[in-house]
Amino acid sequence: MKRFFSVLLFCLGAAISGSELQLSSPRAIKVDDPEDPVQIFAAQELQRHLKMISGIEHPVGETEPATFVIGRKAPSDMERMNTGEGRYTFENNVLYFYGEDYYDRKRSLDKILADRDNRTGTLNSVYTFLDQECGVRWTAPGNDRIVFIPRNSVVLKEKKVNKWRLPLEFAFVRPYFWNPKLIAGNNKRVPEELRFSSSEVYRKRLEHIVWTRRMRLGANEIIRFGHAFTDYQDRFLKTHPEYLGMNQDGSRGLPDQLKNRVKLCVSNEAVVDQIISDWQANGAKKYLNVCPNDGTPGFCRCPRCLALDERRENERFLDHLTDRYVNFWNRIAAKAVKIRPDVTLVTYAYSYYRFAPRREKIQYPENILLGLVPMLMEDNRRIMEEWRKAGVRHFFLRPNDLCYEAVYFRGFERGIWEQFSAARDIGLNGMDFDACIGNPATELDFYIAARAMTKPQMSFEEIEKEYLSIYGSAAPVAKKFYELYRRNGDKMMRKVYRKLKQEKRYLLDSGQIPIVIQEKINFYYPVSLMREASALLEETLQYASELNESERRHLARLKSLNDHSIMTFELVEALNRKAADIEEKRNKLLKYRIQHKDLGFCWPLLFTRPRAEGNLKIR
């Protein structure tokens, strides 16, 4: 998208001394290893963006001499690279892009890019150049959401080695919303006009994966974590049922449909020995994943596990299970460090064991990496500080803030940044957002999250300004639009929080929000605010003659998204009160969705998932 900032370019050119790399005529892009799919992709990405910026197509090939070289270290750069690091260096009229890479070149490109353990330092060097030297911004997945500053040249310092490495050990946003299997299973449950072909799903999924790479998300080191005991029921229910959590009726294990969420009898020392044995059989790697399986059923109620709890008077069984788990982790660590002193146990503080322990302390603080899964609307800074007092020195965050699947703008972008900022100030090793990329109502949320993780020094206002640059001269109007929703966002979230608390439930996942608000939507969302937001955009579209075609298109899309949310609100509100005009509103909404299929929603999942509209039966 074109942005003419001639004054800015003049100031930049005057302030920087260096060599000017001309982009106004075709210059060759050479791939150092033509068998490497990521190097080829890096060259294609450089070519694509340079054409946007300069209007010139720079050819990709193997011919010499080349102006841009992908995958070859600059001759003067003798320094060893860190894992995941990307560098670019301008030397003797050649711009070298290179980095520390870790992936299997025999795999297909999409699989390499999708595997978050793969390190793509060379690709990151291209994106760092485009970000830092060319002002490119990837506001959302897709090439039509790229913002750039047109230019005919770039000024670079001779032999300056420009380095970039992820400031956290890992930073992820999980891009699994456009899941081919999920969509294929639900395609037939939506109107034919809103179904997606397998090729469309593949394209959208790749767009989302590429966006995470463009934002330079990934890892500097392979640290495996996640539900660690999903196979324990299959492995041990018949031979060692005592390994599994005891239910209230004295039985062990869970129903088959929940077996991958089975809990362990954490007081049983044989369970510790089994975990150590499995770890050794797998090579006793540095990181030992002991993250408990989540979900409510199955926490062990045997006398010995109950004796490990530090429960206060009048507390329910599930109110505080942390002490049993800290005791469990300490016992695992005690045996693991004897085998490998630098081992790191990776685990979660989540749901009923997210608060710091009351009795236990972390006995091996250098050997524990704790993933805090924060609850929305909680004082997570205080929770992290209490865990620090219990002995934890190494944290990562694993929020569910981006699992929101409803079509309504929720106004929680600043909350996401503030949560990150609190963790950053206390000390943060990494961050892993469980997420549903693909909801256009949360594009700003995703940009805030991704940019904060890769540029943690940026303020909320700076990141928001970058995102809003997609609207060009209409950015102030778009800013006001989001501020309108932010005005209601905190109130809405607190209402949801209180509602769940009354029902003795927790707001652990933003996917819970649509389920709650759609039971009584006009209590949570003032439709007057939604209409005010649309009127603001409509007035700008009608009377702002200075908008160019691209700015007008993006602003019109924002209005269409908001109009769509109003129509959805009206239908849900009619369903809530069993109104006579439900069918009329349903048909109106379906017609609008068919006319606006390309708004960006994953319709088969929006219609069918309970976290979206599955409970409403909108079709």
Model-derived regions, located:
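Sec-dependent N-terminal signal peptides
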Residues: F4-G13
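Acidic, contiguous N-terminal accessory segments
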Residues: I16-Y88, V147-K160
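Hydrophobic beta-strand segments of well-ordered beta-sheets in folded domains
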Residues: S25-I29, A66-T67, N93-L95, E169-V173, ...
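Feature activates predominantly on carbohydrate-active enzymes
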Residues: P37, A42-E45, H49, E85-R324, ...
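Structured segments of extracytoplasmic/periplasmic soluble domains
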Residues: E45-E57, F129-V136, D278-N282, K335, ...
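Short, internal active-site loops enriched in acidic
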Residues: A74, N293-G298, Y350-P357
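Substrate-binding groove of N-acetylhexosamine-processing glycoside hydrolases
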Residues: N162, S198, E315-R619
